[in-house]
């Protein structure tokens, strides 16, 4: 107990000389893991003046402690105190009291007896009100009550006239008592993140106020009386709804930092130029159309951020701001810059990303101190020759996909102006289709998210020493230092990250659904894959490297329109753009089909493709560190994609503005990285992966555009891959084929076609084996593969070789998948490639997507493939297709790769989650939880070459730690998860006699059975990816949930398991396990936990995504009063200070999972959770009040048991008593939106689209869980708990593949008439139709189905995903072509009367 005690004594001579005892005045027992106050303290009670008991686990204070009447300072932050004893009144000499980060609900009334108390720190406690006696602490000078539950302050609060610092951030305050006008000595007032709708009038009297925070409220205007605060130097009113700033503000003559970011300003007051001392003005993310001429009066300004507005021109007076050092105007509509801008002699950082600039003024050559300039995504034709004078310029970004910060410039004479200019291969820049917002009725995406993604994609990542801090750190609050509140910013950031991840996960979920369909086909292809595996094993690395190189080239080319000259490159360019939008596209391919048939198709594609990958990367970066073995390679692929995702997250958080630059860079990098990771990196050895990641990370820091980052990491990956692979050409060919396939699929795919595609995808993956497929079918399958990740399978060099043999150019597909950053290449042909890929990183990718897809995906796969809308593919890939033809050059292949990769990325994420959801792929429920996996025996179904389950094998989970074992048990089968490196393994897995009836889950188990460690790794890797990245979690399928649960445990446990064991269990595991393995798999693949390169991400991502629970597993203490609930400040918080991550069993990164973990301590304490947590266990274990956590757990557990009596079916052999996740077992009906809270349903996808509410689709819903429902906003804890319960209740036990998600509920068809008003569009997306790519809900149905509904759109309350449209405005939609249905819906004016058929659970 006293080991860490430090005794500080007054400076006195040595007691040996004095012959007397020294006087102990200070004791420090901080961080000693104490559960009670040490008794030895009381021996010094007469002399003790300062006592530090910080960061222990003390639950109550002994009475003796309050006999220490000499005590001046009592420090008890970060403990488990629930009450403050009334006897504290005995400490009459107490001056400083710190009880922050506990579970204290109220102060005792008699605290008023502590007359000399001057500093009280009580932040992060569930304090709902202050006692009246509190206002009698007349000597109080500093009061910190951040992050509590205060709704009001005592009426006589104004008695505290000596207050100098008052922090009340993150409460629920709506007003201040009028008596506060007496607080004339108040210098700092923080009212941020409360519920104020107007600035309290009492502020006008606080004449001494210097720093004022009121960000994150609901203000609509800034009153002029703020101008009376003449001493005010810092004013933060960002993140409100401010539409007007009154002119009286101009009298704040000492104002230095003025933050107006993220409001609704349309103009600034003309008097703003009177603020002569302002050094920082942030007006980004508003609706400004111009800056007033008076802005030139801000003579002292050094930083001006007006990014994300609608400014078309800058006033010439801006040239008067001669002290300007950082200027950001990203994402505006600037067509030219005033020549006066050359007067900025001190400018060092200039951000002009994403505008409409065609020329730059010569005067910019006078900016002698300019170090970083971002000119990407404009319409520049050249650069002024005066740029040669910029001697200090260290980074210049000219395009979205630039691989290096500086590129050689050549002198040329401009034909129009006859002036000497600088140009290079990147000019002329052309605007990206991304600028066009989607105008499709069928689109269902979140504009805000979309905008956020745009920001992310468009960021330049420069590592400029001078401005690095500005960009990477949150916006500076001047030089002000806030009191070091114990409330950890990391937690808030984590919450934000989780939100982002959740959004992405949802996007991924959608994508994964598509991927699943493909996966089913992939299962079929698995056998062929096995044949190709050996080849791919040897060649995959090289091929992947080649692919990466190609991808990089394509990316670079993509950035410039000139890329079009290269057949391959042009598509790549489109793909890159798509990669930005790809996430959306993959997930919303159908939506895009209709909506994107428009010009925005390409954009959407890119966006869709990119975000999902990025999302995956975010959570999966940990996986980056993979072993050098092929197994590791497979992991690498996943980890790479994870890494990409991670980067994308950063990008999302940071946009153009300097403060956001670094993040945005990551985003861009992510998309490219994802691609590279998926394909080349996966195949590359762990070392190369780590290097690549490091490079990526470096690039991220260096290139804030993120464009560069993407390319360079990918290039490196690709280079490595090339080294590994010898079939770069094949990759290209594959890409070409993929493009073709995409076309075919888009134009021809019917539900049958979709199935065919799925089969074809499998065949294609097996290219060598099935060369016979019709070209159309092959093309389609390629498309699907790409979307699903089959392409990734193809990507493996061996596979490529095989593909070449078949005569299909699937190597290109492979490349494409790689481009996506998913190892979808592998996944698409799980059956065929599994064995082959087992040894290569590609395998991992395949297993992920394949797993998801393979479960009976063949039927619905078409639908998933359909998700790839032709339009989208065409935008990015069709050109490539034309260019590529069958023998397109490698660059075209790269382009195709990108497009398909993008799709694939999306698919990969969606694959496991969505596909599983889609199909009754109910992976074995047993896999649902790690504990289940651990304890339960699972029946592994072996599949023959045709992917038919041969006979269930009952496999007892390995005795590995719960989490790990669980993975071993079958979760939803991870089709590609455990591809073994050798064909023999494959044989083991597949038995000739397989029952097609066996659950899709069963099929995956077959794949899973592959014993190859490489396969295992791939499986794990995918899991890890899923877990790490939200997109993985987005998967609603049970497998997904299982993985989620298992992942944390697995993460830790997998390390311990031998590679072989892992493989076998991995096989047993289903997609879920694989997902859960993601974190663990990453480690598993590495073979050692230390390996996780993603460690960086781990801390964050793991916490939230896969390791989230695990990371915080130890911490039972609430981190904050609100337990950092995802909810906004208003959401209710748990009673306990903070839930432990450990409590959150859903290690899954699924959207809902994130929500749970955020809000509810844990659904139930699972052994798996424990182990998982232990894996990620961070030091900061905190205990939530036992009551709260246990109640929640019991509540959830009980609900689960109530609602999900396990109904095991043959397919459920793997099923444990617990379901991996509530999500896992949702019956399709149960998953319908109506069961979920709106917030969940509306969760934005990472893509930037709103995650469609849970799909009510009969088949889908089962796999599709609320997690898919977007949690655009963090739901309140109660909501989360309910949501979890809902999920649990709806999780249907796994059943045979034939059993539809209906297993839980009988579905009745109901015909409904609805009227949708266009505003401005219909707000939903469709798929299917006689030429469509299939219907994700009913692959065998050629009807038109609703696939997405825009959460806030006109159809949000009328339609649900899965609704079949029978008639629209009198036009029959039966046996109608997809394109015709889209065009009809688009041509209808105003309103559309629809007759739909909805399946309702009876």
Swiss-Prot record:
LRR repeats lie at residues 23-44, 47-68, 70-91, 93-114, 116-137, 139-161, 162-183, 185-206, 208-229, 231-252, 254-275, 277-298, 300-321, 323-344, 346-367, 369-391, 392-413. InterPro entries: Leu-rich_rpt, Leu-rich_rpt_typical-subtyp, LRR_dom_sf, LRR_R13L4/SHOC2-like, PDZ, PDZ_sf, Synaptic_Scaffolding_LAP-MAGUK. This is Erbin. The gene is Erbin. One of its GO terms (biological process) is cellular response to tumor necrosis factor. Pfam families: LRR_14 (PF23598), LRR_8 (PF13855), PDZ (PF00595). PROSITE patterns: LRR, PDZ. Residues 465-489, 507-543, 629-694, 824-864, 990-1018, 1070-1093, 1107-1187, 1198-1217, 1222-1274 are annotated as: Disordered. The lineage of its organism: Eukaryota, Metazoa, Chordata, Craniata, Vertebrata. Gene3D superfamilies: 2.30.42.10, Ribonuclease Inhibitor. Its main location: other.
């Amino acid at each position: 107990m006293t080991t860490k005690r430090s005794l500080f004594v007054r400076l006195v001579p040595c007691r040996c000389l004095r012959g007397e005892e020294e006087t102990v005045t200070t004791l420090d027992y901080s961080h000693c893991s104490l559960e009670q106050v040490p008794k030895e303290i009381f021996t010094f009670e007469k002399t003790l003046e300062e006592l530090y008991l910080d960061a222990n686990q003390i639950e109550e204070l002994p009475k003796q402690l309050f006999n220490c009447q000499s005590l001046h300072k009592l420090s008890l932050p970060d403990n488990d105190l629930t009450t403050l004893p009334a006897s504290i009144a005995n400490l009459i000499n107490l001056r400083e009291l710190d009880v922050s980060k506990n579970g204290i609900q109220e102060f005792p009334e008699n605290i008023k007896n502590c007359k000399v108390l001057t500093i009280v720190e009580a932040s992060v406690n569930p304090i709902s009100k202050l006692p009246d006696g509190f206002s009698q602490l007349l000597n109080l000078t500093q009061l910190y009550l951040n992050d509590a539950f205060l709704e009001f302050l005592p009426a006589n609060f104004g008695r505290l006239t000596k207050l100098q610092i008052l922090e009340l951030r993150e409460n629920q305050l709506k007003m201040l008592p009028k008596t506060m006008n007496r607080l004339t000595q108040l210098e700092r007032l923080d009212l941020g993140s409360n519920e104020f709708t107007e600035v309290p009038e009492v502020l006008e009297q606080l004449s001494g106020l210097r720093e004022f925070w009121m960000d994150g409220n609901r203000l609509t205007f800034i009153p002029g009386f703020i101008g009376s605060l003449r001493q005010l130097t810092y004013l933060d009113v960002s993140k409100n709804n401010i539409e007007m700033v009154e002119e009286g503000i101009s009298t704040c003559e000492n104002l230095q930092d003025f933050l107006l970011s993220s409001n609704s300003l349309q103009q600034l007051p003309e008097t703003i130029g009177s603020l002569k001392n302002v050094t920082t003005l942030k007006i980004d993310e508003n609706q400004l159309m111009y800056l007033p001429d008076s802005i030139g009066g801000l003579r002292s300004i050094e930083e001006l951020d007006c990014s994300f507005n609608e400014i078309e021109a800058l006033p010439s007076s801006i040239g008067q701001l001669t002290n300007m050092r950082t200027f950001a105007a990203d994402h505006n509509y600037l067509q030219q810059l005033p020549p006066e801008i050359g007067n900025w002699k001190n400018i060092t950082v200039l951000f002009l990303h994403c505008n409409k600039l065609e020329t730059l003024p010569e005067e910019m050559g006078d900016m002698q101190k300019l170090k970083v300039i971002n000119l990407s995504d404009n319409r520049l034709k050249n650069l002024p020759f005066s740029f040669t004078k910029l001697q200090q310029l260290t980074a210049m970004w000219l395009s979205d996909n630039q691989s290096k910060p500086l590129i050689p410039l050549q002198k040329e004479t401009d034909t129009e102006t006859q002036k000497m200019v600088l140009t290079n291969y990147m000019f002329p820049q052309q605007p990206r289709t991304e600028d066009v917002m989607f105008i499709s009725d069928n689109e269902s995406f979140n504009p805000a998210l979309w905008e956020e993604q745009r920001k992310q994609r468009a960021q330049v990542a420069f590592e400029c020493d001078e401005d690095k801090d500005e960009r990477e750190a949150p916006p500076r609050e001047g030089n002000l230092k806030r009191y070091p509140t114990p409330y950890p910013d990391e937690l808030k950031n984590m919450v934000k990250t989780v939100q982002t991840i959740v959004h992405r996960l949802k996007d991924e979920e959608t994508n994964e659904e598509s991927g699943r369909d493909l996966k089913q086909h992939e299962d079929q292809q698995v056998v062929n894959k096995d044949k190709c595996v050996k080849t791919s094993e040897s060649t995959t690395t090289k091929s992947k490297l080649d692919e990466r190189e190609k991808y990089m080239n394509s990316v670079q080319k993509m950035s410039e329109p000139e890329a079009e000259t290269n057949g391959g490159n042009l598509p790549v360019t489109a793909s890159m753009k798509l990669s930005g939008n790809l996430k959306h596209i993959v997930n919303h391919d159908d939506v895009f089909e209709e909506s994107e048939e428009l010009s925005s198709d390409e954009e959407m594609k890119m966006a869709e493709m990119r975000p999902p990958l990025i999302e995956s990367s975010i959570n999966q970066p940990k996986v980056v560190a993979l072993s050098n073995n092929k197994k590791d390679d497979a992991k690498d692929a996943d980890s790479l994609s994870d890494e990409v995702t991670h980067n994308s997250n950063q990008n999302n958080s940071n946009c153009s503005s300097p403060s956001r630059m670094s993040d945005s860079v990551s985003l861009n990098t992510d998309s490219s990285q994802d691609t590279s990771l998926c394909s080349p990196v996966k195949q590359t050895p762990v070392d190369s992966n780590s290097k690549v990641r490091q490079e990526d990370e470096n690039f991220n820091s260096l290139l804030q555009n993120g464009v560069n980052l993407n390319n360079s990491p990918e290039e490196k990956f690709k280079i490595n891959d090339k080294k590994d692979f010898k079939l770069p050409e094949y990759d290209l060919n594959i890409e070409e084929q993929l493009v073709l396939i995409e076309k075919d699929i888009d134009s021809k795919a019917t539900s049958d076609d979709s199935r065919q595609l799925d089969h074809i995808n499998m065949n294609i993956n097996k290219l060598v084996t099935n060369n016979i497929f019709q070209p159309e079918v092959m093309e389609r399958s390629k498309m699907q593969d790409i979307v699903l990740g089959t392409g990734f399978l193809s990507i493996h060099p061996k596979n490529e070789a095989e593909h070449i043999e078949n005569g299909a150019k699937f190597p290109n597909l492979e490349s494409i998948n790689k481009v996506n950053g998913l190892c979808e290449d592998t996944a698409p042909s799980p059956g065929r490639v599994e064995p082959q890929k087992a040894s290569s990183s590609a395998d991992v990718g395949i297993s992920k997507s394949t797993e998801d897809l393979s479960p009976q995906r063949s039927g619905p796969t078409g639908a998933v493939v359909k998700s790839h809308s032709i339009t989208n593919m065409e935008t990015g890939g069709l050109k490539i297709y034309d260019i590529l033809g069958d023998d397109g050059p490698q660059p075209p292949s790269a382009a195709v790769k990108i497009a398909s990769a993008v799709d694939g990325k999306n698919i990969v994420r969606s694959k496991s989650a969505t596909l599983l959801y889609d199909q009754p792929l109910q992976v074995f429920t047993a896999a649902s939880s790690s504990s289940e996996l651990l304890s339960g025996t699972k029946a592994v179904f072996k599949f023959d070459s045709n992917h038919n389950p041969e006979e269930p094998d009952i496999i007892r989970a390995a005795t590995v730690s719960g989490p790990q074992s669980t993975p071993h048990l079958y979760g939803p089968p991870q089709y590609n998860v455990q591809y073994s490196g050798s064909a023999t393994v494959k044989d083991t897995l597949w038995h000739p006699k397989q029952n097609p009836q066996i659950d899709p889950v069963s099929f995956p188990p077959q794949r899973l059975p592959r014993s190859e460690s490489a396969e295992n790794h791939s499986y794990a890797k995918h899991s890890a990816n899923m877990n790490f990245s939200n997109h993985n979690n987005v998967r609603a399928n049970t497998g997904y949930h299982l993985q989620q649960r298992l992942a944390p445990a697995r993460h830790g446990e997998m390390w311990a398991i031998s590679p072989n064991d892992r493989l076998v269990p991995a096989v047993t595991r289903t997609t879920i396990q694989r997902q859960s393995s993601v974190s663990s798999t990453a480690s598993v693949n590495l073979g050692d936990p230390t390996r996780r390169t993603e460690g960086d991400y781990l801390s964050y991502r793991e916490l939230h995504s896969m390791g989230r629970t695990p990371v915080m597993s130890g911490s039972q203490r609430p981190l904050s009063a609100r337990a950092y609930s995802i909810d906004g400040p208003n959401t209710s918080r748990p009673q306990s200070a903070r839930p432990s991550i450990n409590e959150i069993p859903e290690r899954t990164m699924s959207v809902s999972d994130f929500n749970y973990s955020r809000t509810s301590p844990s659904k139930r304490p699972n052994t798996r959770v424990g182990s998982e947590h232990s894996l990620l266990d961070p030091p900061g274990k905190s205990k939530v009040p036992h009551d709260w956590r246990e109640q929640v757990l019991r509540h959830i557990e009980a609900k689960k048991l109530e609602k999900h009596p396990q109904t095991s079916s043959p397919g459920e052999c793997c099923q444990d008593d617990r379901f991996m996740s509530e999500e896992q077992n949702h019956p399709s009906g149960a998953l319908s939106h109506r069961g979920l809270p709106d917030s969940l349903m509306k969760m934005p996808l990472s893509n930037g689209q709103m995650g469609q509410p849970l799909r009510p689709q009969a088949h889908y819903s089962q796999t599709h869980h609320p997690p898919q429902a977007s949690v655009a906003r963090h739901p309140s804890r109660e909501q989360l708990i309910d949501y979890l319960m809902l999920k649990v209740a709806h999780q249907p036990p796994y059943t045979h593949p034939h059993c539809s998600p209906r297993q839980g509920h009988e579905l009745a068809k109901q015909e409904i008439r609805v009227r949708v008003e266009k505003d401005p569009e219909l707000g939903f997306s469709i798929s299917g139709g006689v030429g469509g790519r299939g219907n994700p809900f009913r692959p065998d149905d050629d009807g038109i189905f609703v696939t997405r509904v825009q959460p806030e759109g006109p159809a949000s309350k009328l339609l649900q995903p899965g609704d079949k449209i029978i008639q629209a405005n009198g036009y029959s939609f039966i046996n109608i072509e997809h394109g015709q249905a889209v065009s009809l819906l688009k041509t209808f004016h105003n309103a559309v009367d629809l007759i739909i058929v909805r399946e309702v659970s009876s």
